[in-house]
Amino acid sequence: MKFTEFSRSQWRVLLILMLVNFANYVDRQIIFSLFPSIRHDFDLTYVQLGYLATAFTVVLSLSTFPLGMLADRISRRTVIGAGVLFWSCATFFSGWAGSFRSLLTARSLVGVGEAAYTPAGAAVISASFPPQIRARVQGVFDIGMFVGGATGIALGGVMAQSFGWRPAFFLVGIPGLLLGLSALRLPEPPASLSRERMPVRELLRVPAFLALLVSGWFSSFAGYAYVAWGPELVQDYKGFSAREAGLALALAVVLGGTCGIATGAYLSDLLAKLRSWGRAVIIPVGFVLGAPAIYFSLHAASKLGFLFFFGLGAFFLSWYHGPLTATIHDLVPPRGHASALGFYYLFVNLFSMAIAPVVIGRIADHYNLITALHVPILAQLAGAAFFLVVIYCIRRNGLHHPVLARHWNDEPCTAFVPAVALTVEGS
């Protein structure tokens, strides 16, 4: 199936959810470009800045799994729309924070809203398109994440220097309200075509999924460390102003990341046609190739050299986005797609992303930020090693592990109108 063969309903689902993902990551990442201004206003340490990111991530992590389970049981449209409206309001009110504590509270509430979106949105995408192109459509969905994150970083830098950090939160909160209302108008999905639920304890008996969790722990630690401390790195060590820092990082991430998402998703779907484990191969390859690029970016002597190597690192590291979600959904029956992805994000966010900003901040306080950012390079290599275990488990047991066999025998759960999911209208 080609992109030109998508029905109008499929394009509508993909476009709206990609735009919501864009807004999701604008709201999520904009704070990192605002760190220097917030630190100056509230007289904070690096560790306190790390706590701002960690509080958001802890709440996001704890909320993702139960909201993912909820999305497998009720209307995914309602879960998505309510989450978007909630996080947009919390982002807007972040601009009114009068103290470090009130800003910490507001950012934590943003985490609740955003936790509702990713598992439900990704489950809807997988249910709306054939498995043969699963990595590519998930890649399109994730392009919203990359472009949104880069836009948040760039916009934050420009707004902080021109107007201050508070108007930045006001500006990005409003569009999310409109997108939340649009999400509520998507076709109403059935929660599931089966009354029986897939217990998570059964999923935890699948070796490939367990190895995937460990790999995700390391790779998420690395990715979040780069995102959290990238703006501080380029301003304190690479000679960029606040405005230049946001724009420069956005350019490197958008060009490298979006090209990497497209490349990784295409290669993943291509390799999936050859072997059951083929889709997963692209992930550790990207992690390994990205490590030297990030290392050279840290030690680049010029701005141009930094941007080249950082963009190259973003290219390779972003190979995993589409294939990761596609691999999880390949391993899990449709009725458990949102729950499985929610549990994955609970684990990797709570136990890696939540601690990454603080760990790197503490090392930076004792040594320096460049030294601290060597730690995530080692973490991404560890993530690659554990994903080789995922591949081994798939080769040994297949994609459909015997533990979950009874759940695969039911009719697949489609997230939206049955005519939209799995087939092209008129085919």
For each feature predicted by the language model, list its residue ranges.
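Conserved MFS/SLC helix-loop-helix module at the cytosolic interface between two early adjacent transmembrane helices
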Residues: 62-98
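Structural signature of the two symmetry-related core transmembrane helices
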Residues: 78-92, 279-294
